[in-house]
């Protein structure tokens, strides 16, 4: 495999973080945690192609980030050719499933 083919084989990910008043400090995403997440992604062989933050009073029970922000992430996924979304907050199984279905990529 050539170096160019290796680069193309990397997972392209959009990173998503939520900062909500109702979450604890450990559960909230911030610049530092998003940088750490990008570093972990790179260590795992992926590449960050975009980052999205959402500020809300509380996580959306269905999508975690809200319908409007999910639409924004979907648009970014398409524009950047991402094949996955990595969320810096814990998701419930149903939130992960709904986001994956709405975004059309692995979450």
Predicted segments — roles?
Residues 1-107:
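N-terminal accessory targeting/assembly segments
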């Amino acid at each position: 495999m050539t170096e160019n083919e290796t680069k193309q084989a990397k997972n392209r990910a959009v990173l998503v973080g939520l900062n909500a008043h109702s979450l604890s400090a450990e559960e909230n995403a911030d610049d530092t945690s998003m940088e750490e997440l990008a570093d972990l992604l790179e260590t795992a062989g992926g590449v960050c192609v975009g980052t999205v933050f959402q500020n809300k009073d509380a996580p959306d029970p269905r999508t975690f980030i809200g319908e409007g922000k999910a639409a924004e992430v979907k648009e970014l996924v398409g524009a950047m050719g991402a094949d996955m979304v990595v969320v810096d907050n814990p998701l419930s199984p149903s939130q992960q499933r709904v986001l994956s279905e709405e975004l059309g990529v692995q979450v």
